[in-house]
Amino acid sequence: MTNSSFFCPVYKDLEPFTYFFYLVFLVGIIGSCFATWAFIQKNTNHRCVSIYLINLLTADFLLTLALPVKIVVDLGVAPWKLKIFHCQVTACLIYINMYLSIIFLAFVSIDRCLQLTHSCKIYRIQEPGFAKMISTVVWLMVLLIMVPNMMIPIKDIKEKSNVGCMEFKKEFGRNWHLLTNFICVAIFLNFSAIILISNCLVIRQLYRNKDNENYPNVKKALINILLVTTGYIICFVPYHIVRIPYTLSQTEVITDCSTRISLFKAKEATLLLAVSNLCFDPILYYHLSKAFRSKVTETFASPKETKAQKEKLRCENNA
């Protein structure tokens, strides 16, 4: 190791971040549990968008498993073995959730785009069987990229404070970590382009048909588009701006101590935004899933509003 590895206190002063991670965890676990209950209670019609949302919810539960461990480790009260477990397992779960979320949000955008721009046609990609198949492929692909980070042997280093996960990695582990980060950035860029193009096509179609009385509710469609796009930008874009420079500081390509500390703090701040998708996803379920929306109405609305919502849902299903 270089001297900067010994004397640069990169991994300190994390306590302020932990309170925000804890808040995200509390809101997220409540929202995810309610979403699970709603999807189980309501017999969904297994449209493509519902399949993608259920996969998104499953990925969110991985994040709820990982966040408590990260919080304890960042508070500095975790035993040494838990720190090692976090570096090998739970940190990877956070990134598995992140890239599954990015990919499934892209498929949700594609599905919405095809529904609104080609409402009279059903493409192969819109069939539930295809959605299940592609969801399986996505899970396998992301796990294939991430799981080796859990399995590659690590160094047996002496217990100490101010230690980062990279210090546990041997040379092959460091190289795989670097490769993984570049692959994940490529995934982010490609699926971001898909989301942007899909949403632009939808907006163009809505604009062309704004005077058509038979066209679906334009305002509702635009809200859905803006919801997905805004949530995506807030959660994932800042993190990926920081990701590559921070990775270079981890591998000591960037050696200046103050720069490394700044990049680490920026990474933690933007990672907080990224995991906050756990809080935004239940809002997404509400706007995109009839089953979830109906269950929310039944649970929290007055009997009169519940009856009106059921009648509206029945009309939508018969349409």
Swiss-Prot record:
Topology in the lipid bilayer: Multi-pass membrane protein
Cytoplasmic domain ranges by topology: 43-48, 111-132, 203-224, 290-319
InterPro entries: GPCR_Rhodpsn, GPCR_Rhodpsn_7TM, GPR171
GO terms of biological process kind: adenylate cyclase-modulating G protein-coupled receptor signaling pathway; G protein-coupled receptor signaling pathway; negative regulation of myeloid cell differentiation; regulation of feeding behavior; regulation of sensory perception of pain
GO molecular function: G protein-coupled peptide receptor activity; G protein-coupled purinergic nucleotide receptor activity; G protein-coupled receptor activity; neuropeptide binding; neuropeptide receptor activity
Annotated GO CC locations: membrane; plasma membrane
Transmembrane segments: 22-42, 49-69, 90-110, 133-153, 182-202, 225-245, 269-289
Subcellular location(s) of the protein: Cell membrane
Pfam annotation, one family: 7tm_1
Segments in the Extracellular topological domain: 1-21, 70-89, 154-181, 246-268
Keywords, ordered alphabetically: Cell membrane, G-protein coupled receptor, Glycoprotein, Membrane, Receptor, Transducer, Transmembrane, Transmembrane helix
Glycosylation sites: 3
Tissue-by-tissue expression: Expressed in both T-cell subsets and natural killer cells, while it is undetectable in B cells or CD14(+) monocytes. Expressed in peripheral blood mononuclear cells (PBMC) and Jurkat cells (at protein level).
UniProt KW Transmembrane helix keyword: yes
Domain of life the protein comes from: Eukaryota
Reported function: G-protein coupled receptor for Big LEN, a 16-amino acid neuropeptide produced from the precursor protein, proSAAS (encoded by PCSK1N). Acts through a G(i)-alpha-mediated pathway in response to Big LEN. Big LEN-GPR171 system plays an important role in regulating feeding and metabolism. Also plays a role in modulating fear and anxiety-like behaviors in the basolateral amygdala. Big LEN-GPR171 modulates the mu-type opioid receptor signaling and antinociception. Acts as a negative regulator T cell function.
Matches recorded under PANTHER family: G-PROTEIN COUPLED RECEPTOR 171, P2Y PURINOCEPTOR-RELATED G-PROTEIN COUPLED RECEPTOR
Family assignment from sequence similarity: Belongs to the G-protein coupled receptor 1 family.
Protein name: G-protein coupled receptor 171
Lineage: Eukaryota, Metazoa, Chordata, Craniata, Vertebrata
